[in-house]
């Protein structure tokens, strides 16, 4: 982690594949690989792990990196257009496109959305919506070009400390907690803290005196017993607002706990107790 500092390292391998090293808290994210697959269920293979570790060794030959240093691996499936003329998967375009099939057995065309990524999903959605509106003979009545996503709304770019101090005073919460949640959720931290400041009186009968890991189940400002960076009320807020169905949803898809290597059986048990009444039965 010290070797890259706060810089991202980007280079292209001889086979055309891109390799990235990104600082992530006290760790480093290393990626990526491109393998053609036919099934929706995938995992990071030993071959890919070996390849990426070798690439790191090329850039930092003086640093020993072993599989035992890996905290977390992730694999996803990205739909790309068929292009048999390319020698490697890395050479296939990532640009988004909507292939419209006009002649179908139905009374409407079929839109086939291919490619794209997180950085272009809003633009892609706008283009497809315009195409759909044109087919329906309708015109656009609004757009989201200037709509800020999530915690970027009303972000205090020049007065961050004042924002933190103000929220801490309004909700009688330690400013260190506010700062931590602000770093995690941006201005969305205000809603999280508001929720954390509310009592859990409705849970008296369910919790009783069976306190989990010595946590007070009625104090939502209490940190978790297994991960002190997260709080009881925060977990419940995310579980409710982000429509968590399984505990794993929170660990892997609503937080960075898995990526930081903090996914343990003890944590899962604790989270299950905290959000049990919010999960679908």
Predicted regions and their residues:
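C-terminal catalytic lobe of FAD-dependent flavoproteins
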Residues: 1-30, 34-213, 217-263, 267-280
